Amino acid sequence: MKKILAAILVGIFLVGVSGVALASTAAEATALVDKAIAFYKANGKDKAFAEFNNPKGQFVKGELYIFIWDLTGKVLAHGTNEKLIGKDVSQLKDVDGKLFVQEGVDLAKAKGSGWVDYKWTNPTTKKVEAKSTYVKKVDDLIFCCGIYK
């Protein structure tokens, strides 16, 4: 009986820990966006975008990285994939057909900030996973950082 109770308690603990890990990752994503916005305001667009596009810079932290869209869904900066810079990704769909970039643009324009949920291939696991991207509008830019759940 004690072994069963111990196993149940371990299971409850692990579920609780995974929830905390997700919350801290979401907090890290929003903090990275806020840090990027502060850097942009302090240093201007050119210097900020050069740093955002640097895969070894201060705005790429493990799986977290900054990317910037304009108000139409064009990529202006990307911390891990420079090939996307200048591309209109507004019509990009996830595996379920969701126009998640357009949803993010619409959300940022309407509310200023928020989270967009969609499914995307995790480059680490190579599997389609649930992902959430935090978007925040500043001037005519949308600062973004995503997390896998």
Regions found by a protein language model. Name each.
Residues 2-149:
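N-terminal membrane-sensor/transducer module of prokaryotic signaling receptors
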